[in-house]
Design a protein with these regions (language model features):
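Predominantly the C-terminal beta-signal and adjacent terminal strand-loop region
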Residues: 82-86, 95, 176-220
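Hydrophobic alpha-helical segments of small multi-pass membrane proteins
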Residues: 112-114, 131-137, 162-172, 188
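Outer-membrane beta-barrel translocator domains and adjoining extracellular loop/strand segments
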Residues: 36-44, 85-92, 141-152, 194-201
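Short sequence motifs at beta-strands and strand-loop junctions characteristic
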Residues: 51-57, 106-111, 158-165, 206-208
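Extracellular loop and loop/strand-boundary signature of outer-membrane beta-barrel proteins
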Residues: 44-50, 97-105, 151-158, 198-204
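Surface-exposed strand-loop-strand hairpins of Gram-negative outer-membrane beta-barrel proteins
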Residues: 31-59, 158-161
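Gram-negative (and chloroplast) outer-membrane scaffold detector with strong preference
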Residues: 19-22, 32, 62-149, 209-220
Length: 220
């Protein structure tokens, strides 16, 4: 924490020789969504539900401005696609047989973000680790891949939602030649969970999207 405060103080000081420089970049990688589950129990019945996401592709573009040697601002657009399987099972001592469903959905997220980046080395360095914090919006849509399995419980149909999100990331920029560079980052984008609300019974966890991103950056 002390290091973060010291570097942040340096970032806000007016630099002597660092001019503001715009940059753009593209990234791609793997998206991993968080899962959720919920169980209701009483003396006569039990109901459980969950959803299981699969890893999927993610791509993005970004544009930013190196404000000085240690501080930058950046806007991102990110897209990802993930298969998600929802299921529910209900059993009762007063009923014969169990009620259940399972259905797989194709989910897509479109994310727009604005972030502040804090670098730990000056722009003259060829290796520049950074931290990023930002906010934005996430739009999620989910379409059924098939009819699935249902017995006594109706599975949800298509659904969508747009939610505010918090974004944090850590990464590293590697300087190449002629203004080009390589970037790796590990990021988490968190929002309220429209998938959990489709479960029976509903889940309660936030939706987190973890991304491993690799890409190129061009400074002007």
């Amino acid at each position: 924490m002390l290091m973060f405060v010291v570097v942040g103080t340096l970032a806000l000081r007016k630099p002597c020789n660092a001019q503001r420089r715009p940059y753009v970049g593209v990234v791609g990688g793997v998206s991993t969504l968080s899962a959720d589950a919920h169980t209701d129990l009483d003396s006569n019945s039990a109901t459980t539900s969950s959803y299981k996401p699969e890893n999927g592709p993610t791509v993005g573009v970004f544009v930013g401005l190196h404000w000085n040697n240690y501080f930058s601002i950046q806007g991102d657009y990110l897209w990802n696609r993930n298969l998600v399987t929802l299921d529910s099972l209900a059993a009762s001592t007063t009923a014969t047989g169990a009620r259940l469903y399972e259905r797989t959905f194709q989910s897509r997220q479109h994310t727009a973000l604005g972030s502040a980046l804090l670098y730990f080395r000056p722009r003259s360095s060829w290796v520049r680790p950074f931290l990023a914090v930002g906010t934005g919006v996430v739009h999620l849509t989910a379409e059924p891949r098939s009819a699935g399995i249902a017995n006594g419980i109706s599975p949800p149909g298509s659904f969508s939602a747009t939610k505010p999100a918090l974004h944090v990331a850590m990464g590293i920029d590697l300087k190449l030649k002629n203004g080009w560079g390589f970037r790796y980052s590990f990021a988490e984008t968190s929002s309220s969970n429209p998938i959990s609300r489709q479960l029976t019974p509903p889940g309660s966890r936030m939706l987190a999207n973890f991304r491993n991103l690799f890409g190129v950056v061009k400074c002007f």
